[in-house]
Amino acid sequence: FESHTNKFNLTYKNRSDEFHGLSIAGPKSRELLQKITRDDVSNSKLKFRDSRHMFIGGVPAIINRISFTGELGYEIYVAPHFQLKLYEEIMEAGKEFNIKPFGGRALMSMRLEKNWGAWTLDYRPDFTAKETGLDIFINWDKDFIGKENAQKDQGSNQLVPLIVQTNDI
């Protein structure tokens, strides 16, 4: 990124420590989310991989419609001092859906079941988009930094899942 910032007179800052995340997922997650926001979170207004700023449970948040679980789901990021309030709002609103908490290890297990790779765990900076299968997310009709190299990538290596069928576990 640094090699291109001067061309566009921009700066960037890592703000990871300014946000903490929660995830809601499952077939009723949209209904739950709609109960705690005034924004329209219908499929047509908040599509897969969309990101929005909105208030969730009265808390300013960044919401991403994406999930490692293999189900409909959302990642919600808030300032650390709002995380407990948001969690309590979600759990209260989710009672009618029989909501249950799940942790990071469960989430990581579910992402493996759906073959959804994670940066630094499964993917490294030296892997190409084609090798990881992430090239399906590239809009080749747009210009972007690295497009020329990405188009040249005709390598034969590709990460694939290994699925073992067993009846004795």
Annotate each PLM feature.
Residues 1-169:
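Conserved, structured C-terminal
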